[in-house]
Regions:
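Conserved AMP-binding A3 loop
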Residues: 48-50, 198-225, 234
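Conserved AMP-binding
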Residues: 78-81, 102, 265, 269
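Short hydrophobic alpha-helical segments of the AMP-binding
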Residues: 84-92, 98, 220, 227
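Conserved pre-ATP/AMP-binding loop-to-beta segment of ANL
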Residues: 166-173, 180-202, 209, 235-266
Length: 269
C-alpha cells in the first residue's frame, strides 16, 4: 500500500479521522470549548456558541412537544438568518430529518419537494409566506411555523421603513414563542450516525425532476471534517466529546489538540 503514496505531496495527510457522532455534536463541542465566542453575526446582532446550542435545545424540545419524532421530515424554507441555524440544529437534536427548501422555488417545485420528502413540519419566513400559504394544503404539512426577522434584528430596514412583525395567520405557530416557551431540554434520541438520515437535499433538476439526496449524520460529519482539513490546515481530532485539530500525522493523545472557534457573518439572500 505504501508504494501508492510514493509521489504523495508532502504535508498532505494520507488518511483523515471521521468520528461517528451526530452532526449536532460539532455544535455541542464548540459550545463547551468556546461558549462566549460568536457563532453568528447578523446585521449587528450576535449569537454565541453557547446561545446557539441552548436555543437549538429549546427548539428541539418544542418540536418534540408538537409530536415530531425520530425520522420525521422537517422542511426549512428560509433565507440566511440566525433562526435557520437554530431550527437546523434543533430538528437534528429532536431526531428529525432536515429538508432544505430554497426560497427561490416556484409553487410547483415547492409542492413537489414537500410531497416527495414527506415533510409534515414546515418552517418559513413571514415575509415570504404568501406562496406557501396558498398551497400547503396540497402537501403533507401538519405543522406550520413562521419566523420573523423583526424578532432577531429590529433595526432592519426594508424600503426605508422599519421592519415590523405582523400577526400570523390563524393556526400558524410563532418560532420565537416556541423557543421561549420550552426549556433547553432536548429529547433523549439515540442516533446511529452511519444509519440515520440527517438531510434530504434536492438536486437542481437540470436534467429532469429533482431527486432527494439522502445523507446520514456520518455523511455530513465526514464532509465537515474534509472542509476543516482543507480550510483549517489540520485533521479533525475528536476526544472526550470535543473536536480539535492535529497538524502532524502520528500525533497521539499526549498532543493537546488545538481548539478553535470561528464566527459566521450572515447576509440575507
Amino acid at each position: 500500500m505504501e508504494k501508492n503514496f510514493k509521489c504523495w505531496p508532502k504535508g498532505i495527510f494520507k488518511n483523515l479521522s471521521y468520528p461517528e457522532v451526530p452532526i449536532y455534536q460539532i455544535l455541542r463541542s464548540a459550545a463547551t470549548q468556546w461558549p462566549w465566542r460568536n457563532a453568528i453575526i447578523f446585521g449587528g446582532s450576535e449569537l454565541t456558541y453557547q446561545e446557539l446550542d441552548q436555543l437549538s435545545d429549546r427548539f428541539a424540545a418544542a418540536l418534540h412537544s408538537l409530536g415530531v419524532r425520530k425520522g420525521d421530515r422537517v422542511a426549512i424554507h428560509l433565507p440566511n438568518c440566525p433562526q435557520f441555524a437554530i431550527a437546523y440544529f434543533g430538528l437534528l437534536k429532536a431526531g428529525a430529518i432536515f429538508v432544505p427548501v430554497s426560497p427561490l422555488l416556484a409553487e410547483r417545485e415547492f409542492v413537489f419537494q414537500l410531497n416527495d420528502s414527506g415533510a409534515e413540519t414546515y418552517i418559513g419566513l413571514d415575509l415570504l409566506f404568501s406562496m406557501p400559504q396558498g398551497c400547503l394544503d396540497r402537501t403533507p404539512a401538519k405543522r406550520v411555523i413562521l419566523v420573523s426577522l423583526a424578532d432577531v434584528y429590529p433595526p432592519l430596514y426594508a424600503s426605508a421603513k422599519p421592519l415590523s412583525k405582523q400577526p400570523f395567520p390563524e393556526g400558524v405557530l410563532d418560532f420565537t414563542d416556541l423557543v421561549s416557551q420550552h426549556p433547553p431540554e432536548p429529547p433523549a434520541v439515540q442516533i446511529e450516525p452511519k444509519k440515520d438520515l440527517a438531510h434530504i437535499a434536492y438536486t437542481g433538476g437540470t436534467t429532469g425532476t429533482p431527486k432527494g439526496v439522502m445523507l446520514t449524520h456520518y455523511n455530513v460529519v465526514v464532509n465537515c471534517c474534509q472542509f476543516a482539513y482543507w480550510f483549517g490546515g489540520g485533521d479533525v481530532d475528536y476526544r472526550d466529546g470535543k473536536f480539535g485539530v492535529r497538524y502532524e500525522e502520528g500525533d497521539g493523545p499526549e498532543n493537546h489538540p488545538a481548539r478553535r472557534g470561528m464566527e459566521v457573518s450572515l447576509i440575507v439572500v
